[in-house]
Amino acid sequence: MRKVWRILLIFIAVIALGYVGLNIFVSQKIKSLLSEEVGNGNIAYANYHFNWLSASFKLDSVTFIADENVISASSIKVNKLNYSDYVFDGVLSVDAIQINYPEVSLWKTTAKKQDSLPKNNGNENQMIKIGQIKLKQGNLSYSIDSTEVLTLQKYDVQFDDVVIDVENKSNKIPFSYQTIEVNGGKLNYILSSLQTLTLDSLMIDEKAIDIHQLQIKPNYSKANYVKVLAHEMDLMDISFHRVNFSDYRFDTQEKIGFSASLLSMDSIQADIHRNKLVADDLTKKKMYSQMLRDLPFDLSIDTLKLSQVDLTYEEVQEKTGETGSIFFKEMEVEAHHISNHPAGNDDFAETKFDIKTQFMGKSPLSVQWRFHVNNPDDSFRITGAGHNISPQQLNSFFVPAFNMKAEGDPIQDLYFDFYGNKYTANGNFKMVYDNVKIKVLKNDNKKSVNKLVTFVANLFVKSENKARENDVEVEKVERDPTKSFWNYFWNCIMEGLKKTVI
């Protein structure tokens, strides 16, 4: 019996010594590789600790350098190297990696230069499995040339069941994970020379993406932004109290994709400003259905909900230099099937928008808008109804834009139903009113009334209320492909107004 125990103890001792010896070998190998990278100027660190019992190691005050890109951390800890996975499966595997206080500075230059990346030494196709990656209290910055375009402050990130597999050609991105959690602080991203995006907090878990205080802010004042424009462009000032994606999914198989069962946005303030004194942008504009079709990734949002939206649109007029404006209050939007996948399917679901709002803050307005993403002619239908619209409400836009002033009793009801494609639109328009007068204004600073032209104009305004009985047909409204869909829709409305009152 003693002999058996002795053999068993010797066996255990040999295994233990072998394990410790293997760890010593691995420790020295890691240290040798680190020394080589230090000599090449790719890495620097203060201390290296290897735990022979747990097959774990730690680096203190670490800095990685690749060209202009620099990644530093107060410490990096790698827990439990799994030798058996490498011996039997050829996979480098560790239980966990924790990176404390990472500072990531990424740099891109637009100037052409020789690629300084090291040549593939044969190890870069090695599959790597990591049970968990944690980044705690990190900061990130990304610059293009001398301009810092992105910063993210005080973020925590956790990935679970990470696989890095360069050889798997079916993955667009050779990095996959089962779950992710992000708790991020302030983000700042320069969208363009005109706009900057900011947010106060970003939280991601396996079920939802939650964003607070998202803002798209102008980089210039309304007076100054036109000085940097080559052609007309909207200046946007938009804030979202909260943006939430529920039941989302990222896909990196074959084609990058994103889906969510619900995208909700709450408490939105949107101010859009356009100056028509700037040269026209004559590039062709896409219909919204084509925009979705042409996305470089698959997108599928089952339901979109916007609540408590206040929207203002301002336009500086080319002829007068005056600013016309319209606004919508308490807007609620619900949309279904915002998707480009699978495009080309005969049963591709119709994209639907249902909108309710207060036009000019007082008049109820509802709109239903439909289109088919997979239709190459970009067919659509948009219907709606407005009620109790005071002519005076229209003057904030009519006076600067058309040099006309509307007066009279409120328009009791207004209905429209337009359908078409990217070329032409037709439909019906109805306006119920009793007494509407049009005053044509003089082209002077006082905006006094041109009595003669006003008298002639009102001879042609229909004073009797026939609209309750007969719809007005709107026919063959041609779309200007250099203008937006909303300009197209506005032209349909104007055609209906002209046929109704004149």
Where are these regions (language model features)?
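Solvent-exposed beta-strand/coil patches in large extracellular/periplasmic or lumenal scaffold regions
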Residues: 121-139, 250, 285-430, 491, ...
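Flexible beta-edge/linker motif
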Residues: 44-111, 119-155, 160-215, 227-275, ...
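N-terminal type II signal-anchor transmembrane helix
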Residues: 1-42, 145-150, 154-156
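Flexible, solvent-exposed coil segments and beta strand-coil junctions
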Residues: 39-40, 61, 114-118, 179, ...
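Amphipathic hydrophobic-ligand
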Residues: 40-41, 68-80, 147-162, 190-199, ...
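Flexible, surface-exposed loop regions and adjacent strand-edge segments
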Residues: 110-117, 278-284, 401-402, 444-450
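Mature-chain termini and adjacent capping regions
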Residues: 9-11, 15, 123, 226, ...
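Extended terminal
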Residues: 2-8, 370-372, 378, 385, ...
